[in-house]
Every structure is written in structure tokens, then in C-alpha cells.
Amino acid sequence: MKIVNTAFHISVSALSGLPEDSFPEIVFAGRSNVGKSTLLNSLTGVKGLAKTSATPGKTRLINYFLINRDVYFVDLPGYGYAAVGHAEKALWGNLLSSYIIQRRSISLVVLLLDSRHPAMQSDRAMISFLESHDRPYGIVLTKYDKLTQKEKVQTGRIMESCAAKAKFIVNYSSFSGKGKSELLAHFDQYICQ
């Protein structure tokens, strides 16, 4: 996939606000502060397209970005830690699960995991959820450049055991761009269906 055109499209807080067109959606999911927005900015080459923050839980809406005028990249709120109350976390959880279960135009879920803390309980729960609803998913290990060689080997083994049904596992560094072309190449088979 070559990205030549990128634009913010819409933010929604309820399923009723989702776009009605039938463009394929590549969905980016992961824990709060795992680097979803940073990854989107890196992939598109547009700094600031997706708002980033050091504070977990800044993304509170489902954000749609129109790519090449015929594909959506969808930035979901993070799961896990966020500086919000239990009631708001429950609303987010219901919104995200309903979206993933009901949205027919989802072509692929890209699950981002912090390579320094792979397969935490919340990540394993998300993997199980995606598999139980037959959603194709791939794994992106973020912050991969911060690992030692030994940690890289250990992380690879952990991921092979807990995400055996993942369509791909890509080691990604937004800093160096490592993994970008590999990840974009994987997207082609999910948007050309």
C-alpha cells in the first residue's frame, strides 16, 4: 500500500455516528499509551494527523482518517489504564466491543502491543475477543528499538505462543521507520478484496 492522500474524516462517540459508506476499515487498537496515534502519524507521514499525548486515555472517540480516498484508518480509544472514571471506562468498553462485533466494513484489526510488555492480561483478553468474533488481526510490536537483542528473542517467543492466529507480527519503530513498509504491504491483501 502506498499512501498518497490522507485526511481526518470524523470523530464519533456512538455507533450511530459511524460513516455510512462502505470503504474498508483498518482498525488500530491497543492499550492506552501504546502508540496508536504515533503509529498512524508515522505510517501516513503526516505529523500531528492523529493527536498524541503522554497522558494515557487522551483518545476518547473513534477517529476516522480517510486514506487514498478509499480506505479508512480507524484510531480506537485505548483500553486499560486511563485517567477517567469507571463509568466512562465502561462506556468505552461497550462502544469498542459493539463496534468490533457489529461493524461489517472492518477488514483488519491491527493490535498494537508495547514490545517491552508484550501480552499483558488486557492484551491477551483482546486477542481472545478478536478470535472469538472471527476478526482477522495482525500484531504490531511498538517501541521495538528500545529492546536488547535478548529481549527481542524473548518477545518473539511470547508472541508466537499467545497470538498464533495473528495474520502477521511486525516489529515497528516510529523513530526509525523500521517495519513501516512491511506493515503497509500486509494491508494490501485486506483492502483489495
Swiss-Prot record:
GO BP term (any one): division septum assembly
Record-linked SUPFAM superfamilies: P-loop containing nucleoside triphosphate hydrolases (SSF52540)
Keywords in alphabetical order: Cell cycle, Cell division, GTP-binding, Magnesium, Metal-binding, Nucleotide-binding, Septation
Cofactor dependency: Mg(2+)
Domain EngB-type G per the UniProt entry, residue ranges: 22-193
InterPro entries: G_ENGB_dom, GTP-bd, GTP-bd_ribosome_bio_YsxC, P-loop_NTPase
Name of a matching Pfam family: MMR_HSR1
GO MF term set: GTP binding; metal ion binding
Listed Gene3D superfamilies: P-loop containing nucleotide triphosphate hydrolases
Keyword Cell cycle: yes
Entry annotated with the keyword Cell division: yes
GO CC annotation: cytosol
Top-level taxon in the UniProt lineage: Bacteria
Record: residues binding GTP: 30-37, 57-61, 75-78, 142-145, 172-174
PROSITE patterns cross-referenced by the UniProt entry: G_ENGB
Residues annotated for Mg(2+) binding in this entry: S37, T59
Signal peptide positions on this chain: none
Function text: Necessary for normal cell division and for the maintenance of normal septation.
Family per record: Belongs to the TRAFAC class TrmE-Era-EngA-EngB-Septin-like GTPase superfamily. EngB GTPase family.
NCBIfam families documented for this protein: GTPase_YsxC (TIGR03598)
Protein name: Probable GTP-binding protein EngB
Phylogenetic classification of the source organism: Bacteria, Pseudomonadati, Chlorobiota, Chlorobiia, Chlorobiales
